[in-house]
Amino acid sequence: MCLYPTLIKNKKYQANKKNGGNIPAVSDKRVLYVPVACGKCMECKKKKSRDWQVRLLEDSKHIKNGKFVTFTFSNESISKLHKDLPIYTNKNKRKLELDGYDRDNAIAKLGVRRFLEKWRKKHKKSVRHWLITELGHEGTENIHLHGLIWTDHEEDIDKIWDYGFTWVQEKEKNINESIVNYITKYINKVDFEHKEYNPIILCSKGIGAKYLKSFFLPFCCYSFV
């Protein structure tokens, strides 16, 4: 349960199209507000980690060609990607450059996006992926990525990722619980050297969708996307 939830107004008790402007009677004023999780406290991160563990493990039962990967960024590639980051403007039209941990995550995001663009150019479609960022703890402390890539063209992973070193799981091995636990631990990992850093997840849509459909469809008439 979230440690620092925010209370927002319950739309059920506001005039809207669904109720045609007829607000239901309120028997208990406490229902006028609903708690929304902050998504940043340790309890929220633990829940997010557990949710992804289930989705990734169940997904690996249906799709067998997943590979555990690590992507790194060299100093040179970080400098180049930093120069290519977009410049944002604030309300006063002043240009703002990202810095600190926001810059690190933006560099990783741009690197992955360009990796996917190159992959689509070669294979005519994107590659299924789930990646999470982490900061190094020795030497340069450069940002890097751990995660999963689903493909039968694992030899192209290293060829297309040209920002630094890559490590790809051996072809004969499958995704298992220990691998999933390893990559999802970064969601709620306590990083004492970078206490303010929040990792980001970069992933394809629909991971775990087959599990959700098989689990929920017997109980409802809706489909999941």
Set out the residue ranges of the language-model regions:
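Right-hand nucleic-acid polymerase module
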Residues: M1-E141, T151-V225
